[in-house]
């Protein structure tokens, strides 16, 4: 019998002020909302994410892309796409993107966090992204240099 492929991944909801974070166990059963990272410099964010990846034995990164109502690229989705590429290269991890259209609104409704400014809403949105990825994919991919 082949060993199960670890689904220990982090999901990132990349915003202008914070990066919401959620993780799951290696079997992809339990999703945990983690403390959001306050945006500073890329190097500082990468250091914090690397420590978290080491602590949780992370095998991949999921990045939310805030596409438009019609599924088209937006200014923020373009920024998140570039950030995803840069952080995946920095952490040497495969990644996948999921459409996060309305994820923050949905997280606010589902978890009663509509007026949150602490970062809990960002991490709740990241948890929804991870839930979506676990059920729909796509597969993680290493970037080609």
From Swiss-Prot:
SUPFAM superfamilies tied to this protein: Ribonuclease H-like
Leading EC class: hydrolase
InterPro entries, A to Z: RNaseH-like_sf (IPR012337), YqgF (IPR005227), YqgF/RNaseH-like_dom (IPR006641), YqgF/RNaseH-like_dom_sf (IPR037027)
Function: Could be a nuclease involved in processing of the 5'-end of pre-16S rRNA.
EC number(s) per entry: 3.1.-.-
Chief subcellular location: cytoplasm
Keyword Cytoplasm belongs to the record: yes
CDD domains: YqgF
Record's protein name: Putative pre-16S rRNA nuclease
Keywords recorded for this protein, A-Z: Cytoplasm, Hydrolase, Nuclease, Ribosome biogenesis
Gene3D superfamilies: YqgF/RNase H-like domain
One GO biological process term: rRNA 5'-end processing
Superkingdom of origin: Bacteria
Organism name: Prochlorococcus marinus (strain MIT 9211)
């Amino acid at each position: 019998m082949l060993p199960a492929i670890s689904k220990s991944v982090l999901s990132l909801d990349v915003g202008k002020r914070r990066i919401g974070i959620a993780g799951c166990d290696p079997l992809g059963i339990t999703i945990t909302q983690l403390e959001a990272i306050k945006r500073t410099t890329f190097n500082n964010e990468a250091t914090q994410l690397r420590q978290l990846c080491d602590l949780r034995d992370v095998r991949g990164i999921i990045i939310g892309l805030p596409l438009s109502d019609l599924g088209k690229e937006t200014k923020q989705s373009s920024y998140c796409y570039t950030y995803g590429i840069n952080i995946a290269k920095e952490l040497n991890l495969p990644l996948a993107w999921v459409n996060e259209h309305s994820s923050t609104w949905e997280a606010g409704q589902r978890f009663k966090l509509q007026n949150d400014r602490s970062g809990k809403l960002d991490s709740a949105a990241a948890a929804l992204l991870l839930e979506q990825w676990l059920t729909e994919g796509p597969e993680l991919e290493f970037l080609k240099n």
